């Protein structure tokens, strides 16, 4: 076996491990506030943000989540904020491509952390740049009060 083949195989193995780690992290992030929070949500007859988006988007149409890893490792002193507490997907509704933004009420009752405002602004930028309609599915407690002084309606 040549040195190039050994290097390739080593790089391939490393990449597979990284992809596996990323997929595990994404599965954890998609639980939002966690399994117990999802169960409480369902017990109230409510759907999660991702469930609501999936029901809205055209069945079997392409879709892409934006910013799933946003806020990873942030706000740990408050229990974390998976995906910034907001789920954003680009997909199709009745054949028209659009952006859907949904507060994740399993994360601190959908309250806005500073990063949620930035993520929402980014969704609006993408919508404007690509001339896409934007749909909001709001289920939010409002601003996360311990950090309310850090949330502004602009980019900075």
Where is each model-derived feature located?
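Terminal-region recognition feature
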Residues: 1-156
């Amino acid at each position: 076996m040549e040195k190039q083949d050994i290097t390739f195989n080593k790089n391939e193995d490393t990449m597979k491990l990284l992809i596996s780690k990323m997929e595990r992290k994404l599965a954890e992030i998609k639980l939002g506030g966690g399994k117990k929070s999802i169960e409480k949500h369902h017990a109230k007859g409510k759907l999660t943000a991702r469930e609501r988006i999936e029901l809205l988007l055209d069945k079997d149409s392409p879709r892409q989540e934006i910013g799933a890893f946003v806020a990873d490792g942030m706000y740990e002193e408050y229990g974390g904020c998976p995906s910034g507490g907001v789920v954003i997907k680009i997909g199709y509704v009745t054949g028209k491509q659009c952006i859907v933004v949904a507060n994740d009420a399993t994360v601190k009752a959908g309250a806005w952390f500073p990063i949620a405002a930035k993520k929402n602004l980014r969704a609006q930028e993408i919508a404007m740049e690509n001339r896409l309609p934007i749909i909001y599915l709001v289920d939010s407690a409002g601003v996360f009060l311990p950090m309310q002084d850090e949330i502004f309606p602009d980019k900075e």
